[in-house]
Amino acid sequence: MKSKCNQSTLKRVIVSAMTLGSAALGTQSYADTGTSIMNVSATVKHSCSIDTNPMAFGAYDGVVANASNALEATATVISTCTSGATAVITMNAGTYAGLGSDDTPIRRMTSGAGNYLVYQVYSDVARKTVWGNTAPTGVGIAGTGSPQTHKVYGSIPSAQIIPEGDYSDQIIVTITY
């Protein structure tokens, strides 16, 4: 007896056989598994950064406007420390400092012609606590991982009779952690 097989059926049989054969060749059989633990670690070190904004006093008049009242201004110091870090922010005496100590420096601005305008920076709004260059006279902080703003309070004492001009100074602000 002769069986009839059309070409379409034959093609489907061949394609099916090839597909099954290639699938069988690409499949691997595994007998068992093994495991291991991979330890992953990192060390986070304390870190801090600091940024400052300028302190601009404006016009000072030791004869009339500031004859009996100090001229005051504020600025900010922004610190960011890793969470849990402890740090202290200190300020040096400035470029043109007079006599004094690191704890209570005599800060001065100059016009560049040998003339000086005495000023001071403080860590409190009452302007009683000088912001100095030592740990006890600096400002202590606890890191949170987020920026923290610290206000700086400045004062130019009254009745300084000095030549007119533009006076300036630079204070180095340091964060130690």
Residue spans of the language-model regions?
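N-terminal signal peptide c-region/cleavage motif recognized by signal peptidases
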Residues: G26-Q28
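N-terminal small/polar-rich segments of proteins
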Residues: Y30-S111, T137-Y177
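Bacterial N-terminal signal peptides
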Residues: V15-A24
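Short beta-strand and strand-turn-strand segments in soluble, beta-rich domains
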Residues: T129-A135
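Bacterial N-terminal signal peptides that target proteins for export
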Residues: K2-S16
